[in-house]
Amino acid sequence: MLAKRIIPCLDVKDGQVVKGVQFRNHEIIGDIVPLAQRYAQEGADELVFYDITASSDGRVVDKSWVARVAEVIDIPFCVAGGIKSVEDASQILTFGADKISINSPALADPTLITRLADRYGVQCIVVGIDTWYDTESDSYQVYQFTGDEKRTKATTWQTEDWVKEVQLRGAGEIVLNMMNQDGVRNGYDLRQLQQMRAICHVPLIASGGAGTPDHFLEAFRDADVDGALAASVFHKQIINIGELKKYLSEQGVEIRVC
């Protein structure tokens, strides 16, 4: 069995790490490189960086900090933000990223997933899915341009259908960003994770809602996700990564303990 992964998420805006609640009202957390170093030292298995306004601004992630991060950490990291072509991806990987993640650009052009997977291999290609639970219809809907409150919009995709589609097109991993839970710290949406796990045959990463060590345990034990991504509990030092991994190991979760 592959070890489960703990993945701090760093949302980047204007060159700094920020964090919002339900993808809104972002506050500045700090500088990118020191935070990346801290998480690597605490025992994170990998890091994810989202340039949250790149797609809505029509630009590609700023590559200067990608190179600086690559110089100071020795764990894998993934970068997302406005990657719309093989050339965009090539530059980010050349600057030191281990994976690239696409979200809104994949919704605009689903063939991008296949082109990237064919060029770099599926192991390099992550698809992020921003999913919102609509109580009236009791359904999960995919959203686009979520880094910009003014441009955020629902797509025509139901989350389950998009999860199936991106796998067919070559996604090597899926990060499910559960918008209702984002930053609230009330736990991951286990029902949604279980539904998507049943149809997901590539690594599935839970994102949105972590507030306690038990929330991570539930995601691994009850939804069988491959990794758990979190931001605010790590940024605000509510949970220490090393202590979290020790707890999970004691509960029987297969995990790399520092």
UniProtKB/Swiss-Prot annotation:
The keyword Amino-acid biosynthesis applies. GO terms for biological process: L-histidine biosynthetic process. GO terms for cellular component: cytoplasm. Its EC number is 4.3.2.10. It catalyses: 5-[(5-phospho-1-deoxy-D-ribulos-1-ylimino)methylamino]-1-(5-phospho-beta-D-ribosyl)imidazole-4-carboxamide + L-glutamine = D-erythro-1-(imidazol-4-yl)glycerol 3-phosphate + 5-amino-1-(5-phospho-beta-D-ribosyl)imidazole-4-carboxamide + L-glutamate + H(+). It holds the Pfam family His_biosynth. Keywords: Amino-acid biosynthesis, Cytoplasm, Histidine biosynthesis, Lyase. Pathway: Amino-acid biosynthesis; L-histidine biosynthesis; L-histidine from 5-phospho-alpha-D-ribose 1-diphosphate: step 5/9. Heterodimer of HisH and HisF. This is Imidazole glycerol phosphate synthase subunit HisF. It comes from Yersinia pestis. The lineage of its organism: Bacteria, Pseudomonadati, Pseudomonadota, Gammaproteobacteria, Enterobacterales.
